[in-house]
From Swiss-Prot:
Record's protein name: Probable transcriptional regulatory protein HY04AAS1_0501
Gene Ontology biological process terms from the UniProt entry: regulation of DNA-templated transcription
Family to which the UniProt record says this protein belongs: Belongs to the TACO1 family.
NCBIfam families tied to this protein: PRK00110.1 (NF001030), PRK12378.1 (NF009044), YebC/PmpR family DNA-binding transcriptional regulator (TIGR01033)
Taxonomic source organism: Hydrogenobaculum sp. (strain Y04AAS1)
Keyword Transcription assigned: yes
GO CC term (a single one): cytosol
Amino acid sequence: MAGHSHWAQIKHKKAKVDAQKGKLFGKLIREITVATKLGGPDPNANPRLRIAIEAARKVSMPMDTIEKAIKRGTGNDKEGALEEIVYEGYGPGGTAIMVVVATDNRNKATSEVRHAFSKHGGNLGSSGCVSYLFEQKGVIEIPKEATDEEKLMEAALEAGADDVESTEDMFIVYTNPKDVYTIKDILASKGFTIESAKTSLIPTTTVEIKDVDTAKKLLNLLEHLDELDEVQEVISNFEIDKDILAALG
């Protein structure tokens, strides 16, 4: 699961910049809308929506903004309906990339994603071209600060988690997708601080990037994709040695 971890570490380092740009608000609004569309407007009956609302409140999103996003998800809104699309493609170094988009304009989204791939030495592929290299997992992120790894490991496995992984500043708890929100609630009830909880695509195998130039091209592509307005998540199956990451600054 190193591909997820490396990009997650890089993403956490730029998270504050995203928040300043207002991009985080946009992502959360779209997540609330899509979650409502797929699972209904009642957060008590729709765990994905409940988690999205919790994340929005955590960054002080106004309640009327949240309610408007829910309304759009039910279709009782004048704005166009959002749909969730997953694009698949190839990146530098033979890497596989999945891009999750929430959009009301499929043609525009496809054009923007294709342009990003082409600009940075990648190729947008057809549906199914790389998805077999990933599996759906529940992903719970817990800040390392003030978290006892042994206690977390014990509590997570007891709650039914598959594995716990350590990154630079986070513990990542992996679960069966259908259990992620239940396990998140169990861990929260035991006093663990939850940074985020969601379902995500996780690589089953990784591709090692062995040179600085390829690593730079790949990370530029992933960052370009992630900065597109309608992109919700970018997942890749790369693994980069820490010395190469250090050389990139």
